[in-house]
């Protein structure tokens, strides 16, 4: 299977957490370049089945090269998994894997507009056919909304987020590329907040990307769908890469366990779902060896839950 240049994070740990049964039915909800799917297929028996999905056009092109009859792919957002796989009989699964966030091929391709370090269009779409780009979003967003997005999705202090938002909107008609945006953010962000080896536009780019792709809403809807599709005893494995993703996963699983939410995790309507998941500790993080090989893995966290 062609996996491109993408290095799957926590590969062995994620597949081990799924506890692959040779004749089981599994879903790789974030196919990417097929790294996790390849390992799952290697562990499945002849009658095992692997379903996979991704909304990225290039990921779909990689999936189209796979001729293994046990493999089934649909191009869609992972929140649409129930509809996509109902016709294939994938409504009762032994395990589902999510590898959240943006992939290395997406980050490294300047034409996708995710990188603050390379010249590219203000795009940031995970689905190339989605109408809304980062440039369109920035042209229409108001200052309060942009401030909230940079604060909540980027983790910037409110006063800093507001300062960055003002600067972006003041320059929005002149923003033609990722480097234009990165420059505006870098100039607006207070120098005292600069961190070694971290570009000053990192958090703002993350925030805008999350907003353009509705990533948090997608995760919430996808976790609901995944819980419905798992059979009793089925395993949910989620790899997250930043605090907001991880908090969203924790909030969902805690609501499904029926436990009180900690103060730092605000309640949402996920608390109305029946308690059907059990969290399986511990949280798994990359080894020092993996981080050395793939520095982008350093913030990854793997959480596992079992459907009761």
Curated annotation (Swiss-Prot):
GO terms for cellular component: cytoplasm. The keyword Methyltransferase applies. Keywords: Cytoplasm, Methyltransferase, rRNA processing, S-adenosyl-L-methionine, Transferase. S-adenosyl-L-methionine binds at residues 34-36, 54, 85, 99, 106. It is an enzyme of class 2 (transferase). Its main location: cytoplasm. GO terms for molecular function: rRNA (cytosine-N4-)-methyltransferase activity. Pfam families: Methyltransf_5. Disulfide bonds: none annotated. It is found in: Cytoplasm. GO terms for biological process: rRNA base methylation. Belongs to the methyltransferase superfamily. RsmH family. This is Ribosomal RNA small subunit methyltransferase H. It comes from Dichelobacter nodosus (strain VCS1703A). The lineage of its organism: Bacteria, Pseudomonadati, Pseudomonadota, Gammaproteobacteria, Cardiobacteriales.
């Amino acid at each position: 299977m062609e996996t491109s240049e993408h290095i799957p994070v926590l590969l062995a740990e994620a597949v081990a957490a799924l506890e692959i049964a040779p004749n089981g039915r599994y879903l790789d909800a974030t196919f990417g370049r097929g790294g996790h799917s390849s390992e799952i297929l290697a562990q499945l028996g002849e009658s095992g089945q692997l379903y996979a999905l991704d909304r990225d056009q290039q990921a779909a092109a990689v999936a189209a090269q796979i001729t293994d009859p046990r493999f089934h792919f649909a191009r869609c957002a992972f929140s649409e998994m129930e509809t996509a796989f109902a016709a294939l009989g994938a409504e009762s699964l032994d395990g589902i894997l999510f590898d959240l966030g943006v992939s290395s091929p997406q980050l490294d391709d300047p034409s996708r507009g995710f990188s603050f370090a390379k010249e590219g269009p203000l795009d940031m779409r995970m689905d190339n056919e989605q109408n809304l780009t980062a440039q369109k979003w920035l042209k229409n967003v108001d200052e309060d909304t942009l401030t909230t997005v940079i604060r909540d999705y980027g983790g910037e202090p409110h006063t800093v987020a507001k300062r960055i938002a003002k600067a972006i909107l003041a320059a929005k008609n002149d923003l033609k590329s990722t480097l234009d945006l990165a420059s505006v953010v870098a100039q607006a962000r207070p120098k005292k907040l600069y961190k070694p080896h971290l570009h000053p536009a990192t958090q703002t780019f993350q925030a805008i990307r999350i907003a353009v792709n509705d990533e948090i809403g997608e995760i919430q809807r996808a976790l609901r769908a995944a819980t419905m599709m798992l059979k009793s005893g089925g395993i949910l494995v989620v790899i997250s890469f930043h605090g907001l993703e991880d908090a969203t996963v924790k909030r969902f699983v805690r609501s499904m366990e029926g436990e009180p939410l900690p103060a730092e995790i605000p309640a949402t309507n996920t608390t109305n779902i029946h308690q059907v998941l059990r969290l399986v500790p511990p949280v798994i993080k990359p080894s020092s060896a993996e981080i050395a090989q793939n520095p982008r893995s350093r913030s990854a966290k793997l959480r596992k839950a079992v459907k009761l």
